[in-house]
């Protein structure tokens, strides 16, 4: 984490900022991204936004792999396989999440679902390359990580175009793997309703209880965060957040969106852990 902070500070200095500006990192990244979105050729260039985001991703990846290696003692290929399962699984269902979250998140972020070429291409390439490295260990999965990675790469190339028609095409490409999978396995889109099928997914009542508790606990936690920060509604939060950013008074530690995002990520991690506990995602399966 210290190395990551030093790298981010260095990148800020290299691009004309001060190291102390790291406390306003969100505002800086938002401004840089808005400037880049106005210039089509700038979207092709690797900039400060990409450098900092990749520093954060690599730091989190390093922590993940180190923790797994030290605590579990798995072989490196098993770690890569687990990483591919988690990454491709999230990428597979991301379009559905975009669809359900669109009415809410659109109020906070104009660029949603994310149509950034670097975002889509990098995730697609990582998923594809990692899947090729450990493909034999992924044969028992009921989805194909290579297929998911391929469509994300295709969506990345299409996202270079800013026309509204192409934005719709990007979403269709992202949801294509799930649509193709649902032809073979109708319960793929809503696997909770699945009892027996060729998808090799078994969800019993105990897991349904865990899932329900997880969803309600997450919603309660989000409501608690809004209450703690003194907001009565998401609309009020959105207006005050935008005003703070414009006035230069934005503080990421006091931003409920950051805390809500961490709650969602933690919930996703607990959901994956529930799958692993039931043996759906495990080193033995891989």
UniProtKB/Swiss-Prot annotation:
Topology class, membrane: Multi-pass membrane protein
Kindly state which keywords UniProt assigns to this record, in alphabetical order: Cell membrane, Membrane, Transmembrane, Transmembrane helix
Q: What is its main location?
A: membrane
Keyword Zinc tagged: no
UniProt KW Methyltransferase keyword: no
| Listed GO CC annotations | plasma membrane
> Which sequence ranges are marked TM in the entry?
52-74, 79-101, 142-161, 168-190, 203-225, 257-276
Annotated localization: Cell membrane
The highest taxon in the source lineage is Archaea
Q: What is this protein called?
A: Uncharacterized protein AF_2133
Query: Which organism does this sequence originate in?
Result: Archaeoglobus fulgidus (strain ATCC 49558 / DSM 4304 / JCM 9628 / NBRC 100126 / VC-16)
């Amino acid at each position: 984490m210290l190395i990551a902070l030093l790298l981010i500070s260095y990148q800020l200095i290299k691009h004309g900022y001060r190291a102390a500006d790291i406390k306003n990192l969100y505002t800086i990244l938002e401004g840089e991204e808005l400037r880049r979105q106005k210039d089509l050729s700038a979207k092709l260039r690797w900039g400060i936004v990409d450098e900092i985001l990749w520093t954060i991703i690599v730091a989190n990846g390093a922590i993940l792999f180190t923790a797994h290696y030290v605590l579990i003692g798995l072989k490196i290929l098993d770690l890569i396989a687990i990483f591919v399962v988690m990454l491709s699984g999230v990428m597979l269902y991301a379009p559905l999440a975009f669809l359900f979250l669109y009415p809410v998140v659109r109020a906070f972020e104009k660029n949603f679902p994310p149509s950034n070429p670097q975002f889509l291409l990098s995730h697609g390439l990582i998923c594809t390359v990692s899947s090729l490295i450990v493909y034999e260990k992924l044969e028992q999965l009921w989805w194909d990580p290579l297929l998911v990675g391929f469509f994300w790469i295709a969506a990345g190339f299409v996202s270079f175009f800013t026309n509204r028609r192409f934005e719709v095409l990007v979403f269709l490409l992202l949801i294509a793997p799930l649509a193709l999978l649902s032809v073979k396995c109708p319960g793929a889109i809503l696997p909770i309703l699945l009892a027996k099928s060729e998808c090799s997914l078994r969800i019993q009542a105990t897991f349904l209880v865990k899932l329900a508790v997880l969803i309600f606990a997450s919603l309660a936690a989000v409501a608690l965060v809004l209450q703690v920060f003194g907001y009565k509604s998401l609309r009020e939060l959105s207006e005050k957040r935008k005003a703070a950013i414009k006035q230069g008074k934005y503080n990421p530690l006091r931003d409920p969106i950051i805390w809500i995002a961490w709650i969602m990520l933690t919930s996703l991690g607990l959901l994956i852990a529930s799958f692993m506990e039931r043996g759906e995602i495990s080193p033995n399966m891989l």
